[in-house]
Amino acid sequence: MKLKSRLLLSGLLLAVLPFAANADMPGKHPAYLHALSDLRAARWMLSHRPGDPAVSAQEDVAITEIDKAIGEIKKASIDDGKDIHDHPSVQEINDRPGRLHKAVELLRKVHGDVAREEDDPFTKGLRDRAIMHIDEATHAAEHAIGDVKNGR
């Protein structure tokens, strides 16, 4: 009886071992997961920055484009399951233009993360649309910076 139990336990261990080995393996597209995290952080910085109505309009455009970029990345099944409003802890930046500059910095980093070589034609299209939305968000945030500098 002990021999049967040991054999059964050994067989079960051998059956489960491959799954345990894959548990710590990084995902197929870790750069996209980093991009999702950075997009959420940029979104938070834009949405939690008090500003003038003209600047806020540009921030709204940037936030909308960030949401669209997140949607494109998630359509590619590169979804970490987090809520769009979930973001990594962000060091509080008190000056109003500081958050805009940090958001632009993050968006440029995201562009680099997402713009990597892609083999799957379906995913290429999603990647290209995500990049378009990221670039639009970057331009809107840059316009918001210009509005702050020009006192608009």
Ranges and model annotations:
Residues N22-R152:
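Long, charged/polar, soluble alpha-helical segments
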Residues M1-L9:
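Bacterial N-terminal signal peptides that target proteins for export
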Residues L3, P18-N22:
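General structural signal for secondary-structure boundaries
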